[in-house]
Amino acid sequence: MNGRADFREPNAQVSRPIPDIGGGYIPTEEEWRLFAECHEECFWFRSVPLAATSMLITQGLISKGILSSHPKYGSIPKLIFACIVGYFAGKLSYVKTCQEKFKKLENSPLGEALRSGELRRSLPPGHYTQKPKYDSNVSGQSSFGTSPAADNIEKETLPRYEPIPFSASMNESTPTGITDHIAQGPDPNLEDSPKRKSVTYEELRNKNRESYGVTLSHKTDPSVRPMQERGPQKEVKVNKYGDTWDE
């Protein structure tokens, strides 16, 4: 026993197996007879009346000038088209009636398939898949009533973990390469160091003027001039032998 009791409601509906009707299904004799009856009734009571009615309506529209006739064949093409449309419309309109006849047929796999399909469509979704209430209640009670031996086995199989100290967990969780130092503020010595004085444009211009004046004074100073720029030299006489003498 697995500890669960499976109860079913007395009025619970069980899904009926749908007969397998595939392409190779061979109808029974009663089904063949009903097929012939449906075909005959559909032809005489639906297809022929609708085809004739559509042809008459088409001819009336052509005679009134609402529909134009063919220049060579007249109204024949439109009448043929109206007849075909009425014929197939009659066959489609008789499908529902023929299905109802097959549903009333006893010992018919085709009728059973039609009845089962209609029953499934009429029921809400999930009707057959819904579990009884007794099953869920009993399963809930059996889950609480487990044996003590099962509890002991579960406790033995569970892994045991030793408590970890808080300090050890903090040390293990700390990433390597990162020190727990407090961010320090700016160095006061750096703040006390004299700041570089900003130079304005006027000061730079005055400084350039002073340097230019010093350079200009050096150029105009006679002591700095080259020897060639000084006064004219004294004339010296030279004889034909290249000797010089002063007068």
From Swiss-Prot:
Residues 192-210, 218-240 have a biased composition (Basic and acidic residues). Coiled coil: none annotated. It comes from the Eukaryota. GO terms for cellular component: endosome. Residues 136-146, 168-177 have a biased composition (Polar residues). Keywords: Endosome, Phosphoprotein. Residues 1-112 form the OCIA domain. Residues 116-247 are annotated as: Disordered. The modification Phosphoserine is found at S108, S116, S193, S198. It is found in: Endosome. GO terms for biological process: regulation of stem cell differentiation. Interacts with OCIAD2. Interacts with STAT3. 'Asrij' stands for 'blood' in Sanskrit as this protein is strongly expressed in blood vessels. The OCIA domain is necessary and sufficient for endosomal localization. Maintains stem cell potency. Increases STAT3 phosphorylation and controls ERK phosphorylation. May act as a scaffold, increasing STAT3 recruitment onto endosomes. Belongs to the OCIAD1 family. This is OCIA domain-containing protein 1.
